Amino acid sequence: MTWSHYLQLMRIENEDERSFYEIEAAREKWGVRDLSRQYNSYLYERLALSRDKEKVQRLSQEGNVITTSKDVLKDPYVLEFVGLEDKYNYSETDLENRLLDNLQQFLLELGKGFTFVARQKRFSFEEDHFRVDLVFYNRLLKCFVLFDLKIGKLKHQDLGQMQMYVNYYDRYEKTEEENPTIGVLLCNEKNDAMVELTLPEDSNIYASQYKLYLPDKKLLQDKLKEWLQEEGGAEDEI
């Protein structure tokens, strides 16, 4: 890494957080601009909120190690680079177009191992036709990752639709050597209790919110502290 990288890292007060960004910047060969973006979008806190207590502690020691489907998830995803505003009356197609127009930034936000495969991937059953918004492949997990974009609040029907997409890919697209398909619903708003009741515990389908602006760091830190306390952790662990 360059001296500019280390100047950026020196500004991070929390030792665990600084260690995480140093490991990731070196491993992923982030440029200074990439490092700045990941820090300013609070990647550390967002990854921590998507993991159990043990893996939160490992983030500062090993960085973001990808071994399971949950390791590639964030909640929320930060999509400030698309240039849309919450008040703007945009459609799912608008969001999809902006994501693909800024594919390099989107891949950075998605994280390790992702490659783009297709948009609006169509498949049919007799006379019924369906389309998956965005299809990616994760080479570390060796599986397809499907993204469905939802404007507004997530509905239980959306989860059922994604289950069908995942089932299709598992049965007709993936090979025997590949791992089960992951489905991610990106939505403005969601009811976590509804999602938990709708999906089985071993489901490979996830719902994550997206934000069109950089999140508030203190809000994420407070949320992480509260979650760690519920898990039996302590505030000084972050």
Task: Describe the residue ranges of each PLM region.
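Basic, low-complexity intrinsically disordered segments
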Residues: 1-238
